[in-house]
Amino acid sequence: MELDAVGKAIVQYHLVPLVHQANLGLEVTMHRVDAHGHLATTAHPQAFGSAQQNHQLRPGFSASALKFTTPVRRDIPALMAYLKGLNTAARRSLDADERLWPLSSTPVLPDDLTNVPLADVDQVSYQRRRDLARKYELQRLMTTGSHVNMSLNEALFTRLYTETFHQQYHSYVDFRNAIYLKVAQGLVRMNWLIQYLFGASPRLAVTDTTSRPQRSSVQHPDGRYSQVTGDYTSIDRYVAKLTAAVRQQQLLSVNDFDGPVRLRSNGQLAMMARQGVYYLEYRGLDLDPTSPVGVDANAVAFVRLLASYFVMMPALPAKMVSQVNAQADQLTRQVLGENPTTASAQAVPAVQVLDALADFVKTYGLPNEDAVLLKQLKSWVTDPKKTLSAQIAMQADPLAWALERAARYQESSNERPFELAGFTALDLSSQQLAQQALTRGVQVDVVDPHANILRLTKLGRSQLVVNGSGTDLNPQALTTVLTHKAAAKQILAEHGVPVPASQTYHTANQLIADYDRYVQAGGIVLKAADESHKVIVFRIMPERGLFEQVVRQLFEQTSAVMAEEVVVASSYRFLVIDSRVQAIVERIPANIVGDGRSTVKTLLDRKNGRALRGTAFKWPQSALQLGTIERYRLDSYHLTLDSVVSRGTQILLREDATFGNGADVLDATADMHQSYVQAVEKLVADLHLAVAGVDVMIPNLYAELVPEHPEMAVYLGIHAAPYLYPHLFPMFGTAQPVAGQLLDALFKNED
């Protein structure tokens, strides 16, 4: 088909890339169900907070329905990543016996549908749901699905209007409306094809075993709870049609219109023609049960491609719109009513449309991913058994099949609780903060995944967070200074707390030359001056050759090394949030404990095989290594990898304990004497820090700290952007909700 004037102008001004850069958002509704597929009887999860404020995770029509809403993204992978994170965060907040129903077809409903619990957000919305239940068929109200919200790139409108179309339209708004209108018309005309390709509800209810299967019972016009059709001839006629339907009591309100395409304004419907269409909402996607999030990126990409196509193609003549829409509605009824396992009567037209789209992609240089997608979709037309609806219809027991998937997706979401799907490029603390934010309805934008920079937005207020806990709650200058260990230690000393004596070296030879001095001192702590997790402790100095080897290896990783006196005590990390100590962990150096039967190697492998152990800073508990230091320590015990360690004997593989070298992390929040808590809180208050990690060596956490014995608490360091994850995933003890506490501090006055 030949391009219209808009399409030709787009080609002339090289604007095709802008056409394809639509802003996309998703709304996905899924039911919470129990292990047998019955609706969950629990209330909307408290973890999601206020339904009025959480616009990302809201209740749907029933109390069991959960509506996921993403922010706008231009990039489909980024959009899907956000939805994955949101879905995973929600799953982890469900009761232990709950999961998300993967089908648009209803799960097991009560015999008496009046017993379906309605969502009770507030009195007004609850009354509206009751009115809906009285007016429409309740089973249809209980079906679910996905909506694609789409707005075209505003730069496209601006450029076209400025260059060419300001003379042909009364206003910029009229021009925008005209483009949106022809895209809406096109999506309505192609609804039958979208449904053929992505329909996934052979029957309205999964428990229905007698009705003839269809391509989509939910999206079929007869499956919609309101039977009002939209008039897409003009914006005025669209508004008039819906307004009349409300006046004639066909609809309770304009929000009840559930046609496949909605024109959405940024205000009242009556003002749409004047204020303009804000975005289009395509409402015709069944849940995809092969995806944990209920949406396949291919479906979103296809809807976007259709929209791009119709932006550049001629609109229907106004006098033909109603007739063509009626024909499209009839075509949709025909295709959706077909047996999904058989060839469609519209297979030839379907292939023709896909071929036309393929030509469009090739001619105007759209991404190759679209060409690959169209080839795949074409195979679904030639072999209908590849379609989702056919796959479901061919199941001997669709209920059991859906339950198996629901259980599998739920289990998968909890396999690695320290990771957040869609956000795994971030560090662990940032992922945990993002999970809590998503759960609470805080929008999470990844500004820079490599630098772990997030922008969190709640009710219009934004906060930047670096490395999971670095925020503007702390003074910027001090935050920068504390990244340098020597400077941080000096600041601690200036505030009157005990710190170990130290000296900073800038070459390996300088440090090696002082070997004899440290032998006389009885030991040494070596720290990379710029990396908190590169620490080596020798309580007894090793032979000179090993010391030289270790020092040179350390200088290969850093430009400066701080040598520090050894403090013999237990190592604790105090986590301060909102100026209060919220969590404390003890760090025990990497070790194995013998059982009288297993070799050292077996004990190492067994400990490293635990669920939360893995690569340092990628897993909550870092794996034990066998490097120079660890082998030296084994030699000091006269052990080899094949030695059997006697029962109950602890072998320390290191004498330092950090989060990155295999240390055991134990929660000590409830055990620590309050005198140490008060001392740490006073220190951070004096420094004007709201968030901090404070490392303290304490011989006895139960003994009261007294001024006469300052050696009872020696401060090793302080961090303005401390790790959150060790407190969320300790090896032993209670996990502390520190990510949520940090969010509370960031948005203290927003609730």
Curated annotation (Swiss-Prot):
Organism superkingdom: Bacteria
Cross-referenced SUPFAM superfamilies, in alphabetical order? Glutamine synthetase/guanido kinase (SSF55931), Glutathione synthetase ATP-binding domain-like (SSF56059)
Q: Which residues cross the membrane?
A: none
MF terms in GO: ATP binding; glutamate-cysteine ligase activity; glutathione synthase activity; metal ion binding
Recorded catalytic activity of this chain's protein? L-cysteine + L-glutamate + ATP = gamma-L-glutamyl-L-cysteine + ADP + phosphate + H(+); gamma-L-glutamyl-L-cysteine + glycine + ATP = glutathione + ADP + phosphate + H(+)
Q: Name one Pfam family in it.
A: ATP-grasp_6
What keywords would UniProt list here?
A: ATP-binding, Glutathione biosynthesis, Ligase, Multifunctional enzyme, Nucleotide-binding
Q: In which pathway does it act?
A: Sulfur metabolism; glutathione biosynthesis; glutathione from L-cysteine and L-glutamate: step 1/2; Sulfur metabolism; glutathione biosynthesis; glutathione from L-cysteine and L-glutamate: step 2/2
InterPro entries (UniProt xref): ATP_grasp_subdomain_1, Gln_synth/guanido_kin_cat_dom, Glu_cys_ligase, Glut_cys_ligase, GshAB_ATP-grasp
Q: Which GO terms describe its cellular component?
A: cytosol
- Under which EC number(s) is this enzyme classified? 6.3.2.2, 6.3.2.3
Q: Where is this region: Glutamate--cysteine ligase?
A: 1-336
Q: How does it assemble?
A: Monomer.
- Family classification: In the N-terminal section; belongs to the glutamate--cysteine ligase type 1 family. Type 2 subfamily.
Identify the PANTHER family for this entry. Answer: GLUTAMATE--CYSTEINE LIGASE (PTHR38761:SF1)
Q: What does this protein do?
A: Synthesizes glutathione from L-glutamate and L-cysteine via gamma-L-glutamyl-L-cysteine.
The name under which this protein is listed is: Glutathione biosynthesis bifunctional protein GshAB
Name the encoding gene, please. gshAB
